[in-house]
């Protein structure tokens, strides 16, 4: 299926993967985007289009994570544009539908795990004063992180142990204690081991 969206001034066409098709679908889509030779402002638009497409899906589609990671690896401005697009999403979470919030939360976890977005993107989050929909968003995001390959989760969150990330580390620890650990223990106890590893990553390295 082809989804065509028209960010000014040129069309950006993304291809959704068919269940019977292979991983070349996101590679093909990334190639098509690259061939558009988008300028700086247009790359920011492309990042927002990616989030919009993902958010509109009925369920999370890994295609967008694979495509986003590949584009971020090739286009620095698009990577920054994606980070800025997420910052805007963080401010508007209370108005987002549950399925949009869930899709974008899972996408963020996948992008962090694939080193497509930096952990520093989370520094703007007010961990001590989250609204209900934001709590849901971050519960979904961290639950998705816990389900990644252990090496991916470690790579995504290891910077929490660095002195420069002390404030973010404190915020994440607060969120884990208030909102993530109770959820895991109640609904997904199979993730307890992964949660313990995440908690270990919040212990500063001397």
What annotation goes with each model-predicted range?
Residues 1, 132-135, 139-145, 149-206:
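Eukaryotic acidic, Ser/Thr-rich intrinsically disordered low-complexity regions
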Residues 44-109, 113:
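Helix-rich alpha-solenoid scaffolding regions
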Residues 36-40, 55, 91-94, 128-131, ...:
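Solenoid-like repeat scaffolds
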Residues 56-60, 72-78, 95-96, 110-121, ...:
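Flexible helix-coil junctions and inter-repeat linker/turn elements that act as hinges
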Residues 96, 104, 109, 123, ...:
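C-terminal transmembrane helix pair
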Residues 24-33, 44-49, 62-67, 77-85, ...:
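Short sequence/structural elements of tandem HEAT/ARM alpha-solenoid repeats
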Residues 35, 52, 56, 69-73, ...:
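Positions within ordered alpha-helical repeat solenoids
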Residues 1-62, 80, 188-200, 204-206:
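Long, low-complexity, highly charged intrinsically disordered regions
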